[in-house]
Amino acid sequence: MSKRSIEVNEEQDRVVSAKTESHSVPAIPASEEQDAPKNDLEEQLSDEFDSDGEIIEIDGDDEINDEDDLRKKQEEAETLVQKDQSEGNKEKIQELYLPHMSRPLGPDEVLEADPTVYEMLHNVNMPWPCLTLDVIPDTLGSERRNYPQSILLTTATQSSRKKENELMVLALSNLAKTLLKDDNEGEDDEEDDEDDVDPVIENENIPLRDTTNRLKVSPFAISNQEVLTATMSENGDVYIYNLAPQSKAFSTPGYQIPKSAKRPIHTVKNHGNVEGYGLDWSPLIKTGALLSGDCSGQIYFTQRHTSRWVTDKQPFTVSNNKSIEDIQWSRTESTVFATAGCDGYIRIWDTRSKKHKPAISVKASNTDVNVISWSDKIGYLLASGDDNGTWGVWDLRQFTPSNADAVQPVAQYDFHKGAITSIAFNPLDESIVAVGSEDNTVTLWDLSVEADDEEIKQQAAETKELQEIPPQLLFVHWQKEVKDVKWHKQIPGCLVSTGTDGLNVWKTISV
């Protein structure tokens, strides 16, 4: 807090100073200083004289000859104190931001992350916004909990000029733990060997002709020693790259990436000029099996036979030709996959079907179903998110032709106030779900929490804000216009998300 002094000149220069933390205190005229009875104001002044605070200084040009001038000077001093204190208080005020309750931010307002709730939080500025990203599996091992961390990932830009778009492979290293230490915490923490290192970002880029709507990395990148990455372009083409040379360049000094590595190894042109968003690699077919769905309701199946890629000429089709917004392969059945449609339907398909039609169609929403996620741990659970900000979890054992019209989600939440843009089950914890939304947040949910839990009830009774929050909500992360969210399977609890303000790499204390 700044310090100023109050200076009063009468027959001779006299200085009466006061320090105050939360009150403005007028000076006492020198002539009255001896005889004035101690009133409440003086008692307050006496109590606070030794505390830290502000000293208001007013320099008189001339002698103050009457009480009116003195009173005017005192009022000016008091106004300055109050103004300074008011501005200081504004800077210190911290409010809890809840997307379903809080007002929109003003033009001069920003949200700041609370560092005490993050174990790790790093922001990566990008040359252009990125609509999609994926984590590249590495050989550094699983269950990595010590710091600093290293991450390989790939993303693609949305440039204002098409020819400036790029497919980017990023190596992020020296990602230190950012959780603030407690004062009582020892300095020799074995888990935090190098807390003060600076993060390092390396990148290898591949030029693109158009914006990439969606990209996916094959889950067999380590075992097959190739990083198969599919991208779905807004021009309708689906490109398959092998990003192994780019990944190798980060760990092999002097390695020269072949020119051929900057070109796709295969291009799916069956979609014509129709763009799309549905894209997924099979987690069970190691040789490579890719599904791609477009905005005209057509889904193409591409497989690798020996060294040659083949796309089935006959697509799987939706009868109403509505857009395929997302695709997910089953984690347990190699021929089964699910799609999300802009007509509000979740459909279950089988690649063995000669009719190339869905086996089951369930009305999941009255608006677009934007994204779906198949649980890695529980093969019959599927999560979905729609354009209204509602997301839910479905038990696929209830998806039968005779019951299709009566199926209801086993859990459903309307916490978000913007379209759901990404959803993902935690691959290491079957009860945790990450949800990204256009309301500028990524939320983490624990489906194992029961609403009638006594501890939850007590917390809600003590805190008004908690009464409006679903008990399953674990965490709210702020990021501008979130587009995609991915879990890192080898670093428990770590997420990577992309928005219009760049990439975030983060891990909370909640997961």
From Swiss-Prot:
GO terms for molecular function: unfolded protein binding. GO terms for cellular component: nucleolus. Residues 1-67, 181-206 are annotated as: Disordered. InterPro entries: Glutamate-rich_WD_repeat, Histone-bd_RBBP4-like_N, WD40/YVTN_repeat-like_dom_sf, WD40_repeat_CS, WD40_repeat_dom_sf, WD40_rpt. Residues 42-67, 184-201 have a biased composition (Acidic residues). One of its GO terms (biological process) is rRNA processing. The keyword Nucleus applies. Keywords: Nucleus, Phosphoprotein, Repeat, Ribosome biogenesis, rRNA processing, WD repeat. The modification Phosphoserine is found at residue 5. Residues 1-22 have a biased composition (Basic and acidic residues). It is found in: Nucleus. Its main location: nucleus. WD repeats lie at residues 319-359, 364-404, 415-455, 477-510. Involved in regulation of L3 expression and stability and plays a role in early 60S ribosomal subunit assembly. May be required for proper assembly of pre-ribosomal particles during early ribosome biogenesis, presumably by targeting L3 onto the 35S precursor rRNA. Associates with ribosomal protein L3. This is Ribosome assembly protein RRB1. The gene is RRB1.
